[in-house]
Amino acid sequence: MSLRPSAKTEVRRNRYKVAVDAEEGRRRREDNLVEIRKNKREENLQKKRFTSSMAFGSATGQTEQDLSSANQLKDNLPAMVAGIWSEDSNSQLEATNLLRKLLSIEQNPPINEVVQSGVVPRVVKFLSRDDFPKLQFEAAWALTNIASGTSENTNVIIESGAVPIFIQLLSSASEDVREQAVWALGNVAGDSPKCRDLVLSYGAMTPLLSQFNENTKLSMLRNATWTLSNFCRGKPPPAFEQTQPALPVLERLVQSMDEEVLTDACWALSYLSDNSNDKIQAVIEAGVVPRLIQLLGHSSPSVLIPALRTIGNIVTGDDLQTQMVLDQQALPCLLNLLKNNYKKSIKKEACWTISNITAGNADQIQAVIDAGIIQSLVWVLQSAEFEVKKEAAWGISNATSGGTHDQIKFMVSQGCIKPLCDLLTCPDLKVVTVCLEALENILVVGEAEKNLGHTGEDNLYAQMIDEAEGLEKIENLQSHDNNDIYDKAVKILETFWTEDNEEEGNDENHAPQSGFQFGSTNVPPGQFNFI
């Protein structure tokens, strides 16, 4: 395992249907959206381990002397084991100190060899030496590094009974011992949801939260925030009654100016908000939304990304919860993420967030329009990488599902038809369906405008779709393997183009042989050739 393993995330609640109401239209995030977090947090993990765990060498790499020292330490493992099993306290301290250094070497620390030597239960006993804090500290450090290994390594720590002792050490008089216990518990909890729940079942949350006070030094603050984040993460999520007490602390932590603290506090909030609406409400009531929106402008992606993820999770809630975000002026911040030079993953996440806002009511869709976001969303739909286009398509489609006729007319005026048509040939079934839904909603408005006499006898939006080569693409979807896509394509053609097809057929049947031939491109203006 790693100290900061990535969490799995749930799939979209609706796979092939753009909803006609806000509840169905909102989507929890997909697994691949979390890759940005996985990569960044693994980078943070390496930095944390190499700068905090190394007993020798510089942060920029090991020198030949360092490597020589590391090899000497490996050769001395049998002597360390003997010292640890001795009854002399000084020998125990010296051997445990060397063991900690051995487990802290930068490249390939011999964690398995140490575990196989059988010393772990003995080192765990040293954690209880309240009369000898130095030994407690060295033992805790060594065990922390073992817990940063594989799940099997972590399980050895658990089976040796270390977890409840680490929790007791959170009340130690030694700040160094407390900090090392915090780190160790973070490693154990970070291994898996099962390990996380075990740590929480021993009552670790309350003493962890007690570490956060005005006198806490920065290194402890960083480690404790990271451990708190691990207590909150994972699927299935921990019982909310165990993690909810962390919300007031997290509200204070997101006010920090320290990048590491902000990063892990925001990830913790993202985990707590990635759930049902009552959990989202608890996060809102903690008062974190205004600060999270401020952090959407943070210069560091490692802070911006989890802040954006949390805001995105909140707007998967109901309309009132979404409105809480809009009332704090989130839309200009989201527009900034679309318009400026942010990397693909951030633009994708911003589009996902916007798509859940456009799944709201007409007033919320209007707020998106008034913020100037539709223009940028259409630009993304035309020009961005496919993964970003996909989220933008959801944003436009949701807006056509819940928007008024005037709002849909505005989206058409911004050029959304052509890029929606272009995506009808993409290999992603969900995207094809989403675009078909959007085009159908647009055609309904075009038909209403025709019936009102605003566009003569023509559905202008049908003509625009034809001119964008969308009609041909929709026709081709009649042979699609996916039944949902086939049904939707047939429905659209039968609803909006049947009359033209019939008229064209009549023209063909009555045309003089010399003037009109089957398959000819000589179609009267306003007619559509299905040949």
UniProtKB/Swiss-Prot annotation:
Report the InterPro entries cross-referenced here. ARM-like (IPR011989), ARM-type_fold (IPR016024), Arm_3 (IPR032413), Armadillo (IPR000225), Importin-a_IBB (IPR002652), Importin-a_IBB_sf (IPR036975), Importin_alpha (IPR024931)
- Return the SMART domains for the record: ARM
Give the principal location in a single coarse category.
nucleus
- Specify where the region named Disordered lies, as residue ranges: 500-524
The ARM repeat units are at 111-153, 154-198, 199-236, 237-281, 282-321, 322-364, 365-405, 406-447
Question: Null mutant: what phenotype?
Answer: No visible phenotype under normal growth conditions, but mutant plants show enhanced disease susceptibility to the virulent pathogen H.arabidopsidis isolate NOCO2.
Which GO cellular component term is one of those annotated? nucleus
Subunit structure comment from the entry: Forms a complex with importin subunit beta-1. Interacts with PRL1. Interacts with A.tumefaciens VirD2 and VirE2.
Which family is it part of?
Belongs to the importin alpha family.
Please give the PANTHER family that the UniProt record associates with this protein.
Answer: IMPORTIN ALPHA
What is the protein name for this chain?
A: Importin subunit alpha-3
User: Which keywords, in A-to-Z order, does the entry hold?
Assistant: Nucleus, Protein transport, Repeat, Transport
Keyword Protein transport attached: yes
One BP term from GO? protein import into nucleus
- Which cellular compartments is it found in? Nucleus
User: What function is annotated for this protein?
Assistant: Binds to conventional NLS motifs and mediates nuclear protein import across the nuclear envelope. Acts as a cellular receptor for the nuclear import of the virD2 protein of Agrobacterium, but is not essential for Agrobacterium-mediated root transformation. May be involved in the regulation of pathogen-induced salicylic acid accumulation.
Any keyword Nucleus? yes
PROSITE patterns registered for this protein in UniProt: ARM_REPEAT (PS50176), IBB (PS51214)
- Locate the compositionally biased regions of type Polar residues: 511-524
One of the Pfam families matching this protein, by short name = Arm_3
One GO molecular function term of this record is:
nuclear import signal receptor activity
Where's the IBB domain? 1-58
